[in-house]
Every structure is written in C-alpha cells, then in structure tokens.
C-alpha cells in the first residue's frame, strides 16, 4: 500500500510537473505567436511613422543647408560691398552731361574709380590717356558724392616745395577749408579719403586712383 501511495504520489507530482510544463509551453507558444503577429503590425506602424518623420528630417536638413548657403552668399555680398573701393552714387536731383562709357556721371562731372594700383605719376598718365585728369576737389556742394568714398585714392593734388603750397594739376591753388590735409607719410602727393580729407603720401607709392572729367 505504501508503494502504491508512493507511486500515486510520484504520478501526481509528474502530472503536476507535466501540467506545469505544458502551461509553460502554451505560454511560450502564445507569447511567440503574439510577438509574430505583433511584429508585422509594429513594423507596419513603424514604417508608417518613419516615412513622414524621414521626410520631415530630409526637409529640415535641406532647409538648413539652404540657410547656410544663403548666409554665406549674403556674407560675401556684404563684405564685398564693405571693402569694395568703388562707390555707389545716389543720382537723385543730379544733373549731368555726356560721359565715357561706364563712368559715373554726377552734377556735370564724370568720375571713374580705378582699382588697379599705380604711383601718382602713372595714375596721372592713365587719366590723361582717357582725356581726363586725376580727381580735383573744388566744391563740397557739387561733389558731395565724395563723402561716400571709403578707401584711399590718388587725386590730382601735389605739394610745391618752393612755396609750400598745394596745387592741382591745372596749377590752381587748393582753396582754404576745402580739404583737411593730414600727414600720413613724408611726400609731395595726396590721397583722397572720405569726408573731404587729404592724406600726404610718397608719390612713388602704388595706390588706386580716381579720374575726373568735366562735362562743361
């Protein structure tokens, strides 16, 4: 009887273990099937969610690149306008006559800003070859555009050591209070800068220059 009880007890334990094992298998099988069924749904949803997200990211990156390119372009334009030696002239209310092609016409004067660097004598010769002279400042009112000049340019003003005066190419004497002469270097020639200032410079130093032609 004890053997039978032991056998029944062992059988009950085995059945219990088998039942538990079957339950575990069933759970695992259910879990596996559920995951297999869930994965396509998740992947499908992921694909559905990823596609707009990827598209948005692509647009954001493209806009970022476009912004960087635009900033670079505008920076280059700004720097070029900041350091460019040529001057943009407001022509409102101005009067003018015929000028050489591509020259600036302002109040019966023609101006050309040359970016090539020459010494004073070479600059003078270049202007003369175009039937013009180096810049002559004679009126703050008629030549108010010269306030916009940002860089240093040769003008037709030269120092006469014998009498200490400053004369223009045509021999006329510099009018008082027309230009503020500033000694930048030892020399007998003058550069024009902004706000009606003249800077003394060695005549052999290469600089850009302004040619001027009167139309009347």
Swiss-Prot record:
Cell membrane listed as a keyword: yes
Gene3D superfamilies given in the database record: Mannose-Binding Protein A, subunit A
Glycosylated residue positions: 115, 131, 163, 202
Key words, A-Z: Adaptive immunity, Cell membrane, Differentiation, Disulfide bond, Glycoprotein, Immunity, Innate immunity, Lectin, Membrane, Receptor, Signal-anchor, Transmembrane, Transmembrane helix
GO MF: carbohydrate binding; signaling receptor activity
Domain C-type lectin: 98-213
Domain of life assignment: Eukaryota
Pfam family of the protein (one): Lectin_C
Disulfide bond positions: 96-105, 99-110, 127-211, 189-203
PROSITE patterns named in the record: C_TYPE_LECTIN_2
Residues in compartment: Extracellular: 73-216
One Gene Ontology CC term in the entry: external side of plasma membrane
Membrane topology: Single-pass type II membrane protein
All ranges on the Cytoplasmic side of the membrane: 1-51
InterPro entries reported in the protein's UniProt record: C-type_lectin-like (IPR001304), C-type_lectin-like/link_sf (IPR016186), CTDL_fold (IPR016187), NKG2D (IPR042169), NKR-like_CTLD (IPR033992)
GO biological process terms held by the UniProt record: adaptive immune response; cell differentiation; innate immune response; positive regulation of natural killer cell mediated cytotoxicity
Ranges annotated as spanning the membrane: 52-72
CDD domains on file: CLECT_NK_receptors_like (cd03593)
Subcellular location: Cell membrane
UniProt function note: Functions as an activating and costimulatory receptor involved in immunosurveillance upon binding to various cellular stress-inducible ligands displayed at the surface of autologous tumor cells and virus-infected cells. Provides both stimulatory and costimulatory innate immune responses on activated killer (NK) cells, leading to cytotoxic activity. Acts as a costimulatory receptor for T-cell receptor (TCR) in CD8(+) T-cell-mediated adaptive immune responses by amplifying T-cell activation. Stimulates perforin-mediated elimination of ligand-expressing tumor cells.
Miscellaneous field: Is not capable of signal transduction by itself, but operates through the adapter protein HCST.
Subunit structure: Homodimer; disulfide-linked. Heterohexamer composed of two subunits of KLRK1 and four subunits of HCST/DAP10. Interacts (via transmembrane domain) with HCST/DAP10 (via transmembrane domain); the interaction is required for KLRK1 NK cell surface and induces NK cell-mediated cytotoxicity. Can form disulfide-bonded heterodimer with CD94. Interacts with CEACAM1; recruits PTPN6 that dephosphorylates VAV1.
Name recorded for this polypeptide: NKG2-D type II integral membrane protein
